[in-house]
Amino acid sequence: EQEILSKNPDQMVVVCCGKGNNGGDGFAIARHLANRNYRVTVVHAGEAKTEDAFKNQQIWEQFGESVSFPSSDASRIINSADILVDSIFGTGLERGIGGAYHEWIEIINDCKAASKWAVDIPSGVYSDDSRIRGQAVRCDFTVSMQFGKTGCFQFPGSSLSGIIFVSDISIPFHADCLKNPDNENHLGTWLSTPSFIKKLLPRRPLESHKGDFGHLFTVCGSSGMAGAAMLASM
């Protein structure tokens, strides 16, 4: 919500909500945006299936406009959006996208919204390994909760995630739900960024010579495959 507010003042927002907790987040986002005088409409998949999502859906329907998908109204509303928020599926997706959901995502991808935002991860991208489950939303921005999701940083999922923001929702690092079963002291996944790599490289005096830091001997492939050896030796 804060990321959308900072970039898109005074525009029409359409929030597409599924039946699970990701959809519940979408209803909450719609409510907060409406409270800040955005014009917001929710397109939803029907009655929410989880307790938290159902509560947020009930709150929204007391004062906000919503339509269910599939319907001609839903398609029209999606195509009228300036900003579209994808909150259909999140990290819990375990099946392929088919039927009405496949059609829904196609309409979202074809609409001419100025910007499309994913909540946590684009719908249809598998969070652990970035596979596409039949169909997936192409987003300009993704706002991941607390930690970036692996599926947003690997292909093909990364090509659909756009610019990625990570939003702190105050989950402590040592929480049980975040522990790696093989090593509870860390999460088990590291994202290579320029700042991360820079920390691994020792600071070298300006007057130093390459010979001051040892020698490297590389054993590589056949004589016709020298490219990798050259790159590794640079």
Stretch-by-stretch model annotation:
Residues 1-88, 96-119:
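Nucleotide and nucleotide-moiety/phosphate-recognizing core
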